[in-house]
Amino acid sequence: MAGARPGVHALQLEPPTVVETLRRGSKFIKWDEEASSRNLVTLRVDPNGFFLYWTGPNMEVDTLDISSIRDTRTGRYARLPKDPKIREVLGFGGPDTRLEEKLMTVVAGPDPVNTTFLNFMAVQDDTVKVWSEELFKLAMNILAQNASRNTFLRKAYTKLKLQVNQDGRIPVKNILKMFSADKKRVETALESCGLNFNRSESIRPDEFPLEIFERFLNKLCLRPDIDKILLEIGAKGKPYLTLEQLMDFINQKQRDPRLNEVLYPPLRSSQARLLIEKYETNKQFLERDQMSMEGFSRYLGGEENGILPLEALDLSMDMTQPLSAYFINSSHNTYLTAGQLAGPSSVEMYRQALLWGCRCVELDVWKGRPPEEEPFITHGFTMTTEVPLRDVLEAIAEAAFKTSPYPVILSFENHVDSAKQQAKMAEYCRSIFGDALLIDPLDKYPLSAGIPLPSPQDLMGRILVKNKKRHRPSTGVPDSSVRKRPLEQSNSALSESSAATEPSSPQLGSPSSDSCPGLSNGEEVGLEKTSLEPQKSLGEESLSREPNVPMPDRDREDEEEDEEEEETTDPKKPTTDEGTASSEVNATEEMSTLVNYVEPVKFKSFEAARKRNKCFEMSSFVETKAMEQLTKSPMEFVEYNKQQLSRIYPKGTRVDSSNYMPQLFWNVGCQLVALNFQTLDLPMQLNAGVFEYNGRSGYLLKPEFMRRPDKSFDPFTEVIVDGIVANALRVKVISGQFLSDKKVGIYVEVDMFGLPVDTRRKYRTRTSQGNSFNPVWDEEPFDFPKVVLPTLASLRIAAFEEGGKFVGHRILPVSAIRSGYHYVCLRNEANQPLCLPALLIYTEASDYIPDDHQDYAEALINPIKHVSLMDQRAKQLAALIGESEAQASTETYQETPCQQPGSQLPSNPTPNPLDASPRWPPGPTTSSTSSSLSSPGQRDDLIASILSEVTPTPLEELRSHKAMVKLRSRQDRDLRELHKKHQRKAVALTRRLLDGLAQARAEGKCRPSPSALGKATNSEDVKEEEEAKQYREFQNRQVQSLLELREAQADVETKRKLEHLRQAHQRLKEVVLDTHTTQFKRLKELNEREKKELQKILDRKRNNSISEAKTREKHKKEVELTEINRRHITESVNSIRRLEEAQKQRHERLVAGQQQVLQQLEEEEPKLLAQLTQECQEQRERLPQEIRRCLLGETAEGLGDGPLVACASNGHAPGSGGHLSSADSESQEENTQL
């Protein structure tokens, strides 16, 4: 979480090595007490150190993933058989007294609760020690846990090669089981590689070398994403990369641009050639210095291309700073394996927590019952089981430093009200821990005011005790008394209280449990004061209480008087969050002697702690109390944690053992953020992922600004902090491989945890369609444009099945993420590596550069290019307006952004400005002077900067609303269908009429002649005139028949268009009203958000003013603090009033604008209806002329060739592409206007 030492880190991590004894194998008796079985087996480890394996009685090979091994134990820490038959077979009870030294227990499991125990007994002497130590080294190897993608694929191959049948062949069913998401694809891939693919068959190991396995994976999991990357690099259709292309790809895409080129020089051609030789197997490509697609894929999954540098995994932080400078991996109620109310307690949980890197464990100790009177550990007044204190201490002594050499803190919650048993507790600590127990403070770090705490390096291998400490009184009262204060010694305000005695056994149903409701989750709660305590101790306050407080509440408040949490001002407020069930008793001299650098005291105030300046005093906060302090005094909390330790623990109402988000309290520098290790929820996953780094030591150095006394830090800052280089990060999820054993859809979430301004949740890809083998997303990247404190930020990439089931995740420190294309091998909830599931992502990590400085940054990166560009622009301008004017214009252009920064801001014509967050100008929000808001102009600027203008959505934009688009589409379809129907009828009638005219002319009945068509001049030819008259009447009947049909159709179409127009108007009106309602709702939310932002600015200003005032002299400070508070109240009231007035005016402007939109809509409707009616009438009046032209071939002045004429002259159906289609387009134009 914080940076490493300056300079190039010398890597201390070593790859896993398997000694010859483990490779060759040793004889053991494997026994299982539950199954009453014992078998002679040969234990072996494969040469890569992936699996522990042996052959069972059924001649099938059993394997155990070494990465799942959590511990190995020998001697008295190994499990002893209890079954008489097994004991007899193993030789217990015989002459050999060294049998315990031959026992070995291997503890394995996916998490600290669900563990299994494999028991072995060596046949030969001196075998167990080697096996136990070497297996544990392999299991805890950091490089093995963070292996490359290629290594994990080789691990899957190794498992298939080990699990052979009785004939020494690889069963096909094992391959189908490993890739069970799509068995048909597996069979096809096996067949394409020339291997047996039937489930009942098997494969000879020599037919299945690693090269064939890689070919099988390529057939099984096609990689179009790799092809696309090659194309982008420049392969351009060729199946390979040249040496130059590979070198450019690594230096430009894979290289972190923040690296110093002297300490970390770019890749040279000789180094690129070595990569080709390592990953390319095709000799022809090798000879030409080329890398094939397969070789490139192997390079992407190689150890050189990890998402993190190995330095982040190694112990790379400075371990010589005081203890308060570190985040310390901490556990709450360590003994519990399930919920807080019921379930078993376990000694094993202490071992698992310590092995997992925990450096602070909790022990809730209660008084033992006669006759043994052995103190025990349990969760008081619940149904959880008990475990002996001695067993717990022995487990801690055995496991404390197996995975980390740095100090362990034992957080005692002491409920043992027996001096004898407290003395026994102290004796157990001394005898069991021996020299590891730190009793006397170090000479360099005495327990004095102003002396910092020792460092983890100073305390390596030491155990520290955190317990209530008794300070030697000035009176002569015996020190061994642990009795509770007699009633007559209590304050008079508590004279009516009954002195409830503490039960010796905290079980449900005990007589005193009724008077002490709640949970005892512990943190120095209810510490009783006796006459032996000094009268002026830190955190002591008046015992006066309201006399009408109910009896149990008053007792509980009295008991909590010396607890470490801050006392609430309301004496009637329940203490459910603290979960107090009973008071913690005072320590005897024996237990007090063991306390030194972690002395718990009740928290009173940050100011009181600063005055005392005792770094060895620490306080505990329940999460709710800590949240209050974090919200109220974040900067003071950070300052407090620079010198002293603080412990945060879950509230008592978390009876399901859920966890709070630890990032909240890391943000203010809290060191001991205690979580329930048995619950692997998101907070615990984040804790496990974060503490994986720095060599899994359990200690992470806090960022520099959280440690330096000369720097102040506001965790709620939203601007760049001077001295901290902010980062920018872009993450693109490209594809996944073998993500599930089921054929389901997969999606990926990308979250960032850090300061409030840095936290982003949740980016998410789409869900793949039933493909968990090789889903490809390749969507737009997820941007984190400004990470203010990258050393405190973590990136979480998690995959889930479409139903929400967890697949795997990875927690990455933002400050260490490499740029480029990388595989992310996923982990389970307990941060153990998964073999096959992986994601291919692309990242861009860089230093954050504000938009205003981008041009300057580019100019610094490439100054020659920048100068050339400026010269080129100057020459281009000189050609147009003359050189002197061009220079002046160029200078003006360069100065304008500095003179008018506001002019560069683009206008925001978004339809819904309520969705846009308000812009905060840097001046008023960051100023800490008391006069920053004094002038009215500045105050108005503050209101204006907070206030976002809200305008009604224009009518033109609402016409593009999806509801309107959908309605127009339906109406257009309706009109098209009506047109087609009318066209068919018109075409049929027109054809019949034209056929009738043609037939009349053919028969000669009414054949017209020139004299018949003109005025009759020959009175004698009456017959011809009669025929002409009959022909004209026939024509008129034909025309009238078609005209009546077309007019009826035109009326129907006009009615339909008018109906559509009214529908569209009504729908648009509904859209307008819905939009206005939504705007009002969002405006209300915006008002609240703006008030909160204003209050936050004013509070921050007040806190900054108070911080400045504290540095002044005492008599001036008090006066100034009073003035600051008075001014803050006045300023807050006035500012909020002005903001409310501005918001009221904005609301009125919005209402007026919305009324204008509605008025515009109402005024448009009659205009559109009249326009549409007129157009339809004009079309109807043109019908007689068009029909006569179609049937008779007449032309009229000003009448062009209509569609019916064209249809008649070309022999086509009238109306097939003319008038009706024109009406269609016109109706569509009418609808488009709405």
UniProtKB/Swiss-Prot annotation:
Regulation: Activated by G(q)/G(11) G alpha proteins in response to ligand-binding to G protein-coupled receptors.
Group of enzyme by EC: hydrolase
Compositionally biased residues, Polar residues: 579-588, 888-907, 1222-1234
Residue stretches making up the C2 domain: 708-836
One record GO biological process: phospholipase C-activating serotonin receptor signaling pathway
Modified residue annotations for Phosphoserine: S474, S490, S495, S537, S927, S1105
Compositionally biased residues, Low complexity: 488-515, 925-936
Modified sites of kind N-acetylalanine: A2
E.C. number: 3.1.4.11
GO cellular component: membrane; nucleus; postsynaptic cytosol; protein-containing complex
Chain segments carrying region Interaction with SHANK2: 1231-1234
Listed SMART domains: C2, PLCXc, PLCYc
Matches recorded under Gene3D superfamilies: 2.30.29.240, C2 domain, EF-hand, Phosphatidylinositol (PI) phosphodiesterase, Phospholipase C beta, distal C-terminal domain
Region described as Disordered: 466-588, 888-938, 1001-1026, 1207-1234
Protein origin, superkingdom: Eukaryota
Tissue: Highly expressed in kidney, skeletal muscle, liver, lung, heart and brain.
Active site positions, chain numbering: H332, H379
Family annotation (Pfam families): C2 (PF00168), PH_14 (PF17787), PI-PLC-X (PF00388), PI-PLC-Y (PF00387), PLC-beta_C (PF08703), PLCB1-4-like_EFh (PF22631)
Keyword terms of this UniProt record: Acetylation, Calcium, Cytoplasm, Hydrolase, Lipid degradation, Lipid metabolism, Membrane, Nucleus, Phosphoprotein, Transducer
PI-PLC X-box domain residues: 318-468
Subcellular localization: Cytoplasm; Membrane; Nucleus
Major location (coarse): cytoplasm
Task of the protein: Catalyzes the production of the second messenger molecules diacylglycerol (DAG) and inositol 1,4,5-trisphosphate (IP3). Key transducer of G protein-coupled receptor signaling: activated by G(q)/G(11) G alpha proteins downstream of G protein-coupled receptors activation. In neutrophils, participates in a phospholipase C-activating N-formyl peptide-activated GPCR (G protein-coupled receptor) signaling pathway by promoting RASGRP4 activation by DAG, to promote neutrophil functional responses.
Subunit and partners: Interacts with SHANK2. Interacts with LPAR2.
Protein name as it appears in the record: 1-phosphatidylinositol 4,5-bisphosphate phosphodiesterase beta-3
Organism: Mus musculus (Mouse)
